[in-house]
C-alpha cells in the first residue's frame, strides 16, 4: 500500500524544490521514499533543469548504480532541460555509452543544447519525445576575459568542442557534418515530428503503451 506526502527538501542536486514522498506500508511497517528515489527503483532517472556539475554527477551515479543492479535491463532517462555545461553533459554522455544497459531517452518539455545531445545519445530505436516537447540544437556558447594568449587558447577550445559536438550529433542522427554545421550555426528549434525526421529521436509517443518505460 502506498500514499503520498509532500516535504521540502534542501540542497537538491537538481534544485527540484518541493518533493513528494511515497509512503509504503507493509507487514514490517512504513517506509518513506522521495518520489525520485522510488522511481529509481523502477530504473527511471531524470534530468530536470540545467546541466550542471551537481546534476551530472547525480545522473552518472544513478546510471552506474542501475548497471550494478541489473546490467541487462533498460534504463529510462527522462529529459526536461535547457542545456548547460558542456563538460558536465559530456560526463553523462560518456557514461551512457560506457555502461552495458541500453539507455532509453524521453524528452518531456524541452531538450535544448546539451540536453538535445543527451536525448539523441539514447539507444537506437529507444529515443522518444512527447507530442508537445521541443528540441533545440546550436553551437556551444563561450566567453572569456584575460590576456590575449589566454583568449586564444579558450577560442581554440571552443572550436574543438563545437567540432566534437557536431561529430556526435552527426553520429547519432545520421545527418552529414555539413548539415549539422549549417543547422547548429544558430539556435534551431524542432518540434516532435521534426525531431524524428532529423534523427534526434526515433518516435513520438502519445501513450505509455507505445514504447517508453
Curated annotation (Swiss-Prot):
Keywords from the named record: Cytoplasm, Hydrolase, Protease, Serine protease
Entry GO MF terms: ATP-dependent peptidase activity; ATPase binding; serine-type endopeptidase activity
SUPFAM superfamilies xref list: ClpP/crotonase
Q: Which CDD domains match?
A: S14_ClpP_2
What's any one GO cellular component for it?
cytoplasm
A single GO BP term for this record reads: protein quality control for misfolded or incompletely synthesized proteins
Stated EC number for the protein is 3.4.21.92
| Location (main, coarse) | cytoplasm
Q: Which InterPro entries match?
A: ClpP, ClpP/crotonase-like_dom_sf, ClpP/TepA, ClpP_His_AS, ClpP_Ser_AS
Keyword Cytoplasm set for record = yes
List the catalytic residues.
113 (nucleophile), 138
Asked if Hydrolase is a keyword of the record, the answer is: yes
Q: Where found?
A: Cytoplasm
Reaction(s) catalysed by this chain's protein: Hydrolysis of proteins to small peptides in the presence of ATP and magnesium. alpha-casein is the usual test substrate. In the absence of ATP, only oligopeptides shorter than five residues are hydrolyzed (such as succinyl-Leu-Tyr-|-NHMec, and Leu-Tyr-Leu-|-Tyr-Trp, in which cleavage of the -Tyr-|-Leu- and -Tyr-|-Trp bonds also occurs)
Q: What does this protein do?
A: Cleaves peptides in various proteins in a process that requires ATP hydrolysis. Has a chymotrypsin-like activity. Plays a major role in the degradation of misfolded proteins.
User: What does the similarity note say?
Assistant: Belongs to the peptidase S14 family.
**How the protein assembles, per its UniProt entry?**
Fourteen ClpP subunits assemble into 2 heptameric rings which stack back to back to give a disk-like structure with a central cavity, resembling the structure of eukaryotic proteasomes.
Any idea what this protein is called? ATP-dependent Clp protease proteolytic subunit
Q: Organism classification, top ranks? A: Bacteria, Pseudomonadati, Pseudomonadota, Betaproteobacteria, Nitrosomonadales
The UniProt gene name for this protein comes to clpP
